[in-house]
Design a protein with these regions (language model features):
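Active-site and donor-binding regions of nucleotide-sugar-utilizing enzymes
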Residues: 1-68, 172-175, 182, 191, ...
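Donor-binding and catalytic core of enzymes assembling or modifying cell-surface/extracellular glycoconjugates
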Residues: 1-5, 121-212
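Short, well-ordered beta-to-alpha junction loops that form the rim of enzyme active sites
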Residues: 24, 111-113, 144-147
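Nucleotide-sugar donor-binding patch of glycosyltransferase catalytic domains
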Residues: 24, 195-296
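Short, aromatic/basic amphipathic alpha-helical patches
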Residues: 25-38, 151-159, 214-220
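Short acidic-hydrophobic, aromatic-tinged amphipathic segments that line or gate anion-handling sites
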Residues: 37-41, 164-165, 233-239
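Glycine-rich, N-terminal phosphate-binding loop of Rossmann-like dinucleotide-binding domains
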Residues: 49, 111-112, 187
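Mid-sequence helix-capping/hinge segment at a functional interface
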Residues: 53-124
Length: 297
C-alpha cells in the first residue's frame, strides 16, 4: 500500500518510462498505467535491508514510510521521483463508487490482528467500550479483516459489532473504508487505506513502531513538518517513561518466552494470545473516544 504513493509519483514524473510492479498485492495497483512484466535485466528490488536501514536513519532525521519508498525507488531506478503524493493512491472503478451501507454513518474497526505480531493487539474489552460509545452517537460499527492465514477477530469471544464483514477481496475492503466516516485500528492496512481516501483514523499505535515512520500527521517531524491530508490521531507511548520505548519503538514481533527474545513488558490476559503489551494497555478507551470526538463533534 505505501509503495503505491511512490509508484504513482514515479509514473507522473516519467510518463515515457515502462514501469511494472511485481508484488503479491496486485489489486492495489489496478487501473495504474503500468507495463507488462519487465525483463530481468531491468528489474530493481526493494529489500528488507533497505527498509531496516531507513528505519534506523529515520530515528535521527524523521521520515515517513511513504517518503522512504520515494527515496529508494529514485535511487534504485535512477529516475526522478519527487515527493508529491505522500499517502497511498488507490483508483476506484465505477462500480466501487457506491456506499456499501446505503446512507448509514459507520466506523470501520479492526478488532483483532495477526498471530505473528501479537504486540500490535489491543484489549478486547476496550473495543467493547468504544463500540458502545459509537452506538450511543448513532453510528454503526463494522468490523472487517481477514479470517485466515494467522488472522483472527475478537468477534469470536465478544459480540460488539453490527457487521462482521469479511470482504472477499481487498478491493471490497477499499470500498468499505472509502465510504466510512472513519477507521479505528492498530498499526495495520486499515490506517493506510484510510489515508488513501483521506479519511479520519484513530490508530492505536502503542510503543512498537516509531510514530514518525507510521503516522499520517505532522506531529512527529515527518513530511517536512506538514502533512497535507486529514491528520490521523496516532495514539502511542514512544517518548514516555516506559523503558522499552523511551526513545523509539522496540520493533519486537513476539512476547519474550523461554524460547525466543522479545517484549518482556506485558500483562496476562484470558484472550488470545494470552498476553497484551503494556504499551497497548496504556491506551485506554477514553483516549480513543476523545480522538473520535475530535472528528465527529
Amino acid at each position: 500500500l505505501c509503495l503505491s504513493s511512490a509508484v504513482h509519483d514515479l509514473l507522473l514524473e516519467n510518463p515515457d518510462a515502462k514501469i511494472s510492479v511485481n508484488t503479491p498485492f496486485v489489486e492495489v495497483f489496478r487501473f495504474y498505467r503500468l507495463s507488462g512484466i519487465c525483463k530481468e535485466s531491468g528489474q530493481v528490488t526493494i529489500t528488507w535491508d533497505h527498509y531496516r536501514q531507513a528505519v534506523e536513519q529515520a530515528k535521527e532525521s524523521p521520515q515517513h514510510v511513504t517518503e522512504f519508498f520515494h527515496d529508494v525507488l529514485a535511487n534504485l531506478t535512477g529516475l526522478p521521483c519527487s515527493k508529491r503524493t505522500l499517502r497511498p493512491v488507490i483508483h476506484s472503478a465505477a462500480n466501487e463508487r457506491v456506499n456499501p451501507f446505503a446512507e448509514n454513518k459507520y466506523w470501520v474497526v479492526f478488532a483483532g490482528g495477526k498471530s505473528d505480531i501479537p504486540l500490535k493487539l489491543w484489549y478486547g474489552p476496550y473495543f467493547q467500550q468504544v463500540a458502545d460509545y459509537l452506538h450511543s452517537c448513532g453510528r454503526l460499527v463494522v468490523q472487517t479483516g481477514r479470517s485466515k492465514d494467522r488472522h483472527y477477530h475478537l468477534r469470536q469471544s465478544i459480540k460488539i459489532f453490527d457487521d462482521n464483514y469479511k470482504p472477499s477481496n481487498i478491493r471490497r475492503l477499499f470500498q468499505i473504508i472509502k465510504y466510512a466516516e472513519g477507521v479505528i485500528c492498530p498499526i495495520t492496512s486499515g490506517m493506510h487505506i484510510a489515508a488513501a481516501f483521506d479519511k479520519p483514523c484513530v490508530v492505536i499505535g502503542g510503543g512498537r513502531e516509531d510514530p514518525w515512520w507510521e503516522a499520517y500527521n505532522s506531529d512527529y517531524g515527518a513530511f517536512g513538518g506538514h502533512y497535507s491530508g486529514v491528520p490521523h490521531k496516532y495514539l502511542n507511548t514512544v517518548g514516555t517513561d516506559m523503558p522499552c520505548c523511551r526513545l523509539s519503538g522496540c520493533w519486537n514481533r513476539q512476547f519474550q518466552n523461554i524460547e525466543t527474545e522479545g517484549c518482556d513488558n506485558f500483562a496476562k490476559t484470558v484472550e488470545f494470545p494470552g498476553q497484551i503489551a503494556h504499551c497497548m494497555l496504556a491506551i485506554d478507551p477514553s483516549s480513543v473516544i476523545a480522538a473520535i470526538d475530535s472528528y465527529i463533534r
